[in-house]
Amino acid sequence: SALLEAMEEEKVTVDGITHNLPVPFTVIATENPIGSSGTQMLPESQLDRFMICLSMGYPEHRDAVDILKNNGAKSLSGIQAVITSEDWKKLQKMAEESYVSEEMYDYIVRLTENTRNHPMLRLGASPRASLALLRMAKAMAVMKGRDYVTPEDVMDIYQEVLAHRIKLNMQAKAQGL
């Protein structure tokens, strides 16, 4: 619950004392395969708090060789920052201030609502999914150099935002979907 508090509220409570986390604050987590020692599935309500789900895939051959040569070293000393905290905050502010038309709000809500009534889904996208889709679409717009959201921005990130939030029903699984 401490991680969820940090993710949702950007603060943590230790021994009854609440501490604000630094801004910007970002959580990047990995997911081990179910069945691995010590792993348990997260409940849907907790999965829903993760904004996006990405598959990193396997490293390219050359990168895999480098990993072996470095003996899997965990040193972060060679990592160089690609953005400052101040620039990150500016980008976040730009995304927050991006214009969203009434039609775009309606579009996002319709996309998530449609998952709730789909005959092949046991669990559709929550209102939190709509919020995540909106935030990510705004970020996509900023990355493309715009201050307004388009349907293309939404569709560019739709799968990554919804994949971990919707669940197939037994019929869909039986059909191999």
Predicted segments, located by residue:
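An amphipathic alpha-helix signature
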Residues: H61-K69, Y105, V109, M155
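C-terminal engagement/docking regions of AAA+ P-loop ATPases
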Residues: N117-L177
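Residue-level recognition of specific faces of alpha-helices
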Residues: T30, I67, M94, Y107, ...
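Conserved catalytic core of Hanks-type protein kinase domains
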Residues: A6, Y58, L111, L133, ...
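Canonical AAA+ ATPase core
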Residues: A2, M7-I83, W88-S98, K138-M140
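Conserved AAA+ ATPase small/helical "lid" subdomain
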Residues: G78-S130
